């Protein structure tokens, strides 16, 4: 009689768990629901350390946890077998939406405060920021300006987080994203996404590591860096961008430059999403010009779910729902007609 509870528990776990290396993900959750989880990187992995010299902390000045990571999945929705890694502060509205599309989502704690500390020389070296981004993402030695070991890189923290999620929330099918031998993530099933600084690091990482797609809100930037023109392990048709025309990134040709150097012009023209319905001519370059009262700061953060996003005056509902779904789910092989490079967009920028 004493063995019955253990047997029942084992049976329950076997019903919910996912075998590593599966070709297709299917949920087997006896109580389908929207799961939302949090965990500290330092509690998941004892190797995690703080790097105060670049503002990469485990606790803030008040002693509060600074390394909390977020994850969510909705097992009521048929899974697409794709994992979104969000490279910015947690955005509940965005996570709710990508979960509703059938996507898993996590936000990992990684080094992203270095931007105001490192690469301050003028002119800045053309590889300086790109190399730090790659080291922050991989935990490998690409830069002399920082020292970020493997356990503190985005790749390893994402891997350790997904392993933890697989144990804590087997109903969510997180094990699907682990390699067959359980030693890493299935990166070709990962969607790298971020805004501004986070979108820039996402795109830099995708040059190095083949991923399912990149979703860049208000980015990438790095107008004085050359990494955008490097060969890409991620096919060019998998990069998607969305920004507001009053965002300062357009004033300095940051976005047009990055988008063209990444090859996004080969898959369609700039499309104003407020004037064309989805699927937006299958393009990769999406813009909006809705009224932000001339506020460039609002424009910069207006293209993702949040208080500054475009909402209907009468309904109060978001007006870019179709855009967000397109960015994360549009078939990568469905592409628009190639366009020429814009001669008015300055590609060779110097400080």
Tell me what each language-model feature is:
Residues 212-309:
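The feature captures the conserved acid-bearing segment of alpha/beta-hydrolase catalytic domains
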Residues 102-119:
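Conserved alpha/beta-hydrolase
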Residues 8-16:
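Bacterial N-terminal signal peptides
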Residues 23-76:
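N-terminal cap/lid segment of alpha/beta-hydrolase-fold proteins
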Residues 127-182:
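Alpha/beta-hydrolase active-site loop
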Residues 193-198, 202:
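Gly/Ala-rich beta-loop-alpha elbow adjacent to hydrolase catalytic centers
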Residues 180-194:
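Alpha/beta-hydrolase fold nucleophile elbow
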